[in-house]
Amino acid sequence: MSIELKKVSKRFVDNVVLDGVDFFVAEKETVALLGPSGTGKSVLLKHIIGLIKPDSGEVWVDGQQVPLLGRKELAALRSRIGYVFQNGALFDSMDVFENIRLGISDEEKYADKEYCIQRVRECLRLVNLNEEVGRKFPSELSGGMRKRVGISRAIAGKPTYLLYDEPTSGLDPVNADVIDSLIERLQEEIGVTSVVVTHDVRGAFRVADRIALLSKAKIRAVGTAEEIIASRDPVVQQFLERDLEMAVIQANEVPTTERRIGGR
C-alpha cells in the first residue's frame, strides 16, 4: 500500500526534470511534494500513475513496478488511484453528478443508477457540498467549488491512493484554507495514502505528515514540518522565506471581512 520511487531520472530533450530521485510514501501517510513551479512535481505524479516512464530507476506502487505493467494490470492499478487535477478537469458538457460519476471505475457499479446516486451524494457530502450542486454545470461553479467537485470525483471510486496536483492553485487564501481543511478531513475519514503536489508551504505544513522539497531535479530535503523549518540547507531556507513573503502579500490582498470569515 506504499508508493516508492528509487533513483528515478527523467529528461525531455536537454531538460533534466528528475535526477536520481528517491521518494517514499508509507501506507495511509500524506506526503507533500513542495517546490517552485516548473521543477518536475507534476512529472513525478505522472510517473506514479504510469502516464510517464522513467529513463532510469524504479517506480513502485502497491507492490508493483509501474513501468513494467501491461495494459490490464495498469488499468487495475489506476482504478485504485484517485487523481485531483490542477484545473479540476471537469467536462463542461456534463453536470456535476455525471462528472463525479465518471470517478466510479467499477463497471457494474457505474451501470447501477441507484448506487451511483447514493455514491455521488456521499462524495458531495465528504467535500461539504449539498446534493443540489449535482444538477449544476461546471460553468455555474466558483473556482473553489470546481476544486471540491474535482476532489469528489477523485474519491468516487473509493481509491487506496490520492494524488493531488496543486489543489489550491489559483485560489485566494480563504478558499485555499477550505481545500486544505478538506484534505485533512478526508485523510481522517477515508484513510488513503496521499501525495500532495504544491508550491504552498503553509498548506503543505498543515496537511502533510512529511514534506519533500524538489529543487533542480533533485529531492533536496525530506522531513516533518519541524525538521524542514530547522534545516540549514540554504535552498530550503530560501524557499521558505520566499513563501512567507508571498503569504504576507496574499493576506494583504484579501478583504478584511474575508480574513475574519476564514479565521472563524
Language-model region placement:
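Helix-to-loop junction immediately C-terminal to a conserved catalytic motif
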Residues: 49
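Conserved ABC ATPase "signature" region
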Residues: 64-65, 113-132
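ABC-type ATPase nucleotide-binding domains, specifically the catalytic core motifs of the NBD
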Residues: 94, 101-115, 126-127
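Conserved ABC ATPase signature
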Residues: 137-141, 145
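Conserved catalytic motifs of ABC-family nucleotide-binding domains
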Residues: 158
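Catalytic Walker B motif of ABC-type/P-loop ATPase nucleotide-binding domains
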Residues: 162-165
